[in-house]
C-alpha cells in the first residue's frame, strides 16, 4: 500500500497536469526497477503521439539510459510537430532518472 506522502504527491502532480492538459499533449513517465518508459499522449483524441523506452536504448547506468530515452522521445516528438507538452511524472519524485529524462527531453527541443 502506498504511503500517505506518495498519495498526496501523486494527487498534487495530477492536479497540475489536469490544469494544463486541455491545450497541450501530456508527456507521461513510467519507471520500473529495471526500465523507464515515456510517451506523449494526446488526451483529447486518446492517441499516443510518440513513445520511447529503455528496453530499446541501452547506455551505461540507469540515469544515462533515462537521458537517452528523453532525447529519443524529443526527437520523435519534434519530427511529428509536437514541441509543447505537459510533464506528467505521476507519483515519482522529480529526482534521479525522472529528472534526467526531463532535462534531456528539454535539451532535445520539448518545452514544458
Swiss-Prot record:
Keywords: Ribonucleoprotein, Ribosomal protein, RNA-binding, rRNA-binding. InterPro entries: Ribosomal_uL18_bac-type, Ribosomal_uL18_bac/euk. Pfam families: Ribosomal_L18p (PF00861). One of its GO terms (cellular component) is cytosolic large ribosomal subunit. One of its GO terms (biological process) is translation. The keyword rRNA-binding applies. GO terms for molecular function: 5S rRNA binding; structural constituent of ribosome. The keyword RNA-binding applies. Signal peptide: none annotated. Belongs to the universal ribosomal protein uL18 family. This is one of the proteins that bind and probably mediate the attachment of the 5S RNA into the large ribosomal subunit, where it forms part of the central protuberance. PANTHER family: 39S RIBOSOMAL PROTEIN L18, MITOCHONDRIAL (PTHR12899), LARGE RIBOSOMAL SUBUNIT PROTEIN UL18M (PTHR12899:SF3). Part of the 50S ribosomal subunit; part of the 5S rRNA/L5/L18/L25 subcomplex. Contacts the 5S and 23S rRNAs. This is Large ribosomal subunit protein uL18.
Amino acid at each position: 500500500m502506498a504511503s500517505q506522502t506518495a498519495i498526496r504527491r501523486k494527487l498534487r502532480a495530477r492536479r497540475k497536469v489536469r490544469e494544463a492538459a486541455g491545450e497541450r499533449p501530456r508527456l507521461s513517465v513510467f519507471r520500473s526497477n529495471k526500465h523507464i518508459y515515456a510517451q506523449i499522449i494526446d488526451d483529447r483524441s486518446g492517441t499516443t503521439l510518440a513513445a520511447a523506452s529503455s528496453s530499446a536504448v541501452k547506455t551505461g547506468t540507469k540515469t544515462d539510459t533515462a537521458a537517452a530515452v528523453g532525447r529519443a522521445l524529443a526527437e520523435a516528438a519534434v519530427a511529428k510537430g509536437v514541441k509543447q507538452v505537459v510533464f506528467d511524472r505521476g507519483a515519482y519524485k522529480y529526482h534521479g532518472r525522472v529528472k534526467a529524462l526531463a532535462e534531456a527531453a528539454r535539451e532535445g527541443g520539448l518545452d514544458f
